[in-house]
Amino acid sequence: MKRVADVLIVGSGVAGLYASLNLREDLEIIMVSKKSVNLCNSSLAQGGIAVARGKEDFQSFIEDTLKAGKYENNIDSVRVLVEESMDNINKLIDLGANFEKDENGVLFTKEGAHEINRIVYHKDITGKHVEDILLENVKRRKNIKIIEDCEMVDIYHRGNRCIGALFNKDGQDLSIYAKVVILATGGIGGLFKKSTNERIITGDSIGVAIRNNIEIKDLSYIQIHPTAFFSKKSEEKRFLISESVRGEGGKLLNCNGERFVDELLPRDIVSKKIYEEMKKTNSNNVFLDVSFMEKSFLQNRFPNIYNKCLEEGIDISKEPIPVAPAQHYFMGGIKVDLNGKTSMENLYAFGETSCTGVHGANRLASNSLLEALVFSRRGALEINSYIDNLELIIEERECEDLDKYRLLNRKILIDEICRLRGDIKDELVTCGGECKKSS
């Protein structure tokens, strides 16, 4: 089966959706989703979106981002992120986003390692709210076609020019050819036994990139979130207890009810302290306590967390939440420039799939959705400016072994992560004996 478009977008999270809305409406766009269109990590982002509160906040925001990233960030990317943050928040509001407000305007909350309150948010479901708003807008665009339940297994290229991609659609091969291809398939959390990510997020684009000699960067930079709800279900998605809970004053306690860390330190430091405390006390988890806060405040500020914990038998207004670290975010990915362009012509990568270098070795809280917005818009605007000069190339291809390539992509990525991070190899899932057959 074969289809054609001006632009092919692989992925339907915030990065992919926002890119499509910033592309010209006279362009034919196909967006492909691995499962249902709204099953993505973007919908799991709870805390909010960081934004510079005016030019006077630029340097502080830049410094907070650099400090969290161990000063291994790309400084040019950080400047772009910060200086273009408010423009993109305003565009989201124009599209229908409804961030929390009081009589003086938009409210800003604080999260770990931010010097000031600069996070806009929608209750404790900011990512889902933004995803829903963007998807509503996309569905109104007649030039955007969505294909669900369709997994990418390879890209097509002529020399160093990307011309399309190959997909597994219901066990059949689907070839989509386009002038420009955008990869926005998210991170690698589905490769870990304990992750806050959706299980389908398995680094598909990154495995494909490695196999096709596209430049990648910082694959060893994997973020562990300090506070995922502790469950004895060993290989299921872990429910995130947002950074904003600590930002509002939540306290981390050991099994003896003692505080042991400054809750607003960067994520990697808090996670390390929790691991040390768990080892010291021979415990599987620590506790995040908000029981001293008003019940009405908790229900209003964190309705999703409040109700989810109740489902697990925990009333957070009366007892602390059992938490433990879990894989959360991937700072590495496909190396891109300031417009999301990869080392292959006419191929872009946005969001967690990409590596802009903006996060350095450790992402600052609430910079993930912001990165997806800022750089996908920049890339879309660049595509708008030159796509009319590109030729659509269609090549006849023989039917591929879809399962072989799917498993090989995963094996290549897992092997590379294990090579770089032998310390976490036991935390990774395997793709079973089938991987050996595909190598």
Swiss-Prot record:
Its predominant location is: cytoplasm
Its function, per the record, reads: Catalyzes the oxidation of L-aspartate to iminoaspartate, the first step in the de novo biosynthesis of NAD(+).
Keywords, ordered alphabetically: Cytoplasm, FAD, Flavoprotein, Nucleotide-binding, Oxidoreductase, Pyridine nucleotide biosynthesis
Q: Which organism is it from?
A: Clostridium perfringens (strain 13 / Type A)
Q: Which NCBIfam families does the annotation name? A: PRK06175.1
Spell out the GO cellular component terms annotated for this protein, sorted alphabetically and separated by semicolons.
cytoplasm
Q: Does the UniProt entry include the keyword Cell inner membrane?
A: no
Q: What is this protein called?
A: L-aspartate oxidase
Localization recorded for this chain is:
Cytoplasm
PANTHER family documented for this protein: L-ASPARTATE OXIDASE, L-ASPARTATE OXIDASE, CHLOROPLASTIC
Q: Name one GO biological process term.
A: 'de novo' NAD biosynthetic process from L-aspartate
Give the superkingdom in one word. Answer: Bacteria
**What does the organism's lineage look like at the top?**
Bacteria, Bacillati, Bacillota, Clostridia, Eubacteriales
| Family of this protein | Belongs to the FAD-dependent oxidoreductase 2 family. NadB subfamily.
